[in-house]
């Protein structure tokens, strides 16, 4: 589905919808009673959801071997369409042995609640070390993405999926805006250019600065924080969402910002994930995407601007969405403003660099981040959350 009047078509031209109608859902529930059941972990559940709502268009299910190999080797699907990360369903060899290609498999959560169905078209083994090297550029088990990969099952199941019903998000139902809805909102507001911003951290002054720089040249900002699985030391989603609400209320032009949750899981795949994040935002209807310093990175596995350079490996028309590449922003003590090296006359020692890590360290010590780091309302919320949890963020 693509609607005329949309600012940009979905990736591949059609917005995928794999959510069953109420009538279909009833039939599928009956069918599922006679199917083998597979219990999905948090990442697989969020992947199922993202496929079903069209966030991963053109994917209609979990990848087969041909697409998987092609994505690993070329960052394109087998049909030539740009795609940078494998979206796969791993299971143990024991579970896979009991499943036959051509079967329908019931997909359930850890508690056994039926979520959807998979039409199993293929099952295949894969090389974990090779996938780690290709996707994450490292085989180090300390890398959170590699760690997940090494711990998961050794067989991938492939095939189209159907989600039985779209449930409201348990924590943020008001911010659950799926691609068809975000596109509708952009049309209603008359936005022709929309910039997407991906985050898994509270928004500090550096993020605010680059978002507002982007807002100077586009019609609207789609603030799209990730609320799927993240590292255990990332700040909890409910705290982050409260920070975003306060910021938009006090410091942004509200009519030019839409806040929505992104239910995807974080891979920490750095450059490849930056492309992936851009394509997902294209499906939500964004024409532009902010790529900052060390986008989707972790530790020191990637260079600070590797996630920007990777966009140069694709022709602009292959991606369709325009990356807005920003340098690391800081508070310039010479001009008394936020800036980057492109706009500041300061020397390195006259710059206050901001990072989520620094803020977490300050909070751990019981300190309130200064206004050069964070807006006071955000700093207060983070400090309160730290006290309530009584443990490091």
Swiss-Prot record:
One of its GO terms (molecular function) is sulfate adenylyltransferase (ATP) activity. Pfam families: ATP-sulfurylase, PUA_2. Keywords: ATP-binding, Nucleotide-binding, Nucleotidyltransferase, Transferase. Transmembrane segments: none annotated. Pathway: Sulfur metabolism; hydrogen sulfide biosynthesis; sulfite from sulfate: step 1/3. Disulfide bonds: none annotated. It catalyses: sulfate + ATP + H(+) = adenosine 5'-phosphosulfate + diphosphate. InterPro entries: ATP-Sase_PUA-like_dom, PUA-like_sf, Rossmann-like_a/b/a_fold, SO4_adenylyltransferase_pro, Sulfurylase_cat_dom, Sulphate_adenylyltransferase. The keyword Amino-acid biosynthesis does not apply. It comes from the Bacteria. Belongs to the sulfate adenylyltransferase family. This is Sulfate adenylyltransferase. It comes from Synechococcus sp. (strain JA-3-3Ab) (Cyanobacteria bacterium Yellowstone A-Prime).
